[in-house]
């Protein structure tokens, strides 16, 4: 059974991101567009809570149900919400195209109801040596976010 979800991002960065997963055993395809980004890399993560009552700050930390360190999307040791970076050319829109085998739209670890956050700076993928590298990827301010909601198939 295919599951689809959508996230409307608001803030200084704005856009729409779509999620699709064919079954609980297949990767999630993430696609969409974001505007309002400076040229360069921007951290792109799923955060724990679907709470935007205090803007992006109330979305909590990266979604990390297994207590792992921050890492790159290809790392075994990573938060489930670590989706790496999206690259802005300076023109609007910035395309989002990610396939990830760790996140899911099924079961207890589903990202539906959680928040996508776009960050001001590049995610160092846990390898930057900064005090925040192993928790946030030192990706800077939260400049756009939105709650992931279930979408019509």
UniProtKB/Swiss-Prot annotation:
<keyword id="KW-0186">Copper</keyword>
<dbReference type="GO" id="GO:0008340">
    <property type="term" value="P:determination of adult lifespan"/>
</dbReference>
<comment type="subunit">
    <text>Homodimer.</text>
</comment>
<dbReference type="InterPro" id="IPR001424">
    <property type="entry name" value="SOD_Cu_Zn_dom"/>
</dbReference>
<protein>
    <recommendedName>
        <fullName>Superoxide dismutase [Cu-Zn]</fullName>
        <ecNumber>1.15.1.1</ecNumber>
    </recommendedName>
</protein>
<dbReference type="InterPro" id="IPR036423">
    <property type="entry name" value="SOD-like_Cu/Zn_dom_sf"/>
</dbReference>
<keyword id="KW-0049">Antioxidant</keyword>
<dbReference type="GO" id="GO:0048167">
    <property type="term" value="P:regulation of synaptic plasticity"/>
</dbReference>
<dbReference type="GO" id="GO:0005507">
    <property type="term" value="F:copper ion binding"/>
</dbReference>
<feature type="binding site">
    <location>
        <position position="62"/>
    </location>
    <ligand>
        <name>Zn(2+)</name>
    </ligand>
</feature>
<keyword id="KW-0963">Cytoplasm</keyword>
<dbReference type="Pfam" id="PF00080">
    <property type="entry name" value="Sod_Cu"/>
</dbReference>
<feature type="binding site">
    <location>
        <position position="79"/>
    </location>
    <ligand>
        <name>Zn(2+)</name>
    </ligand>
</feature>
<keyword id="KW-0560">Oxidoreductase</keyword>
<feature type="binding site">
    <location>
        <position position="82"/>
    </location>
    <ligand>
        <name>Zn(2+)</name>
    </ligand>
</feature>
<dbReference type="InterPro" id="IPR024134">
    <property type="entry name" value="SOD_Cu/Zn_/chaperone"/>
</dbReference>
<feature type="binding site">
    <location>
        <position position="119"/>
    </location>
    <ligand>
        <name>Cu cation</name>
    </ligand>
</feature>
<dbReference type="InterPro" id="IPR018152">
    <property type="entry name" value="SOD_Cu/Zn_BS"/>
</dbReference>
<keyword id="KW-1015">Disulfide bond</keyword>
<dbReference type="GO" id="GO:0005777">
    <property type="term" value="C:peroxisome"/>
</dbReference>
<feature type="binding site">
    <location>
        <position position="62"/>
    </location>
    <ligand>
        <name>Cu cation</name>
    </ligand>
</feature>
<keyword id="KW-0479">Metal-binding</keyword>
<dbReference type="GO" id="GO:1901526">
    <property type="term" value="P:positive regulation of mitophagy"/>
</dbReference>
<feature type="binding site">
    <location>
        <position position="45"/>
    </location>
    <ligand>
        <name>Cu cation</name>
    </ligand>
</feature>
<keyword id="KW-0862">Zinc</keyword>
<feature type="binding site">
    <location>
        <position position="70"/>
    </location>
    <ligand>
        <name>Zn(2+)</name>
    </ligand>
</feature>
<dbReference type="GO" id="GO:0042803">
    <property type="term" value="F:protein homodimerization activity"/>
</dbReference>
<comment type="function">
    <text>Destroys radicals which are normally produced within the cells and which are toxic to biological systems.</text>
</comment>
<feature type="binding site">
    <location>
        <position position="47"/>
    </location>
    <ligand>
        <name>Cu cation</name>
    </ligand>
</feature>
<comment type="similarity">
    <text>Belongs to the Cu-Zn superoxide dismutase family.</text>
</comment>
<feature type="disulfide bond">
    <location>
        <begin position="56"/>
        <end position="145"/>
    </location>
</feature>
<dbReference type="GO" id="GO:0004784">
    <property type="term" value="F:superoxide dismutase activity"/>
</dbReference>
């Amino acid at each position: 059974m295919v599951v689809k979800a959508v996230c409307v991002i608001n803030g200084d960065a704005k856009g729409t991101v779509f999620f699709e997963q064919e079954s609980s055993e297949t990767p999630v395809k993430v696609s969409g567009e974001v505007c309002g980004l400076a040229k360069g890399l921007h951290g792109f993560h799923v955060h724990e809570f679907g709470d935007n009552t205090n803007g992006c700050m109330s979305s909590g930390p990266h979604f990390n149900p297994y207590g792992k360190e921050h890492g790159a999307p290809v790392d075994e040791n990573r938060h489930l919400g670590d989706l790496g970076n999206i690259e802005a050319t300076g023109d609007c829109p910035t395309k989002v195209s990610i396939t990830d085998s760790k996140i899911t739209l099924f079961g207890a670890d589903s990202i539906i109801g959680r928040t996508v956050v776009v960050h001001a700076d590049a995610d160092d993928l846990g390898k930057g040596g900064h005090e925040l590298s192993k928790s946030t990827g030192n990706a800077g301010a939260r400049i756009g976010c939105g709650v992931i909601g279930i979408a019509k198939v």
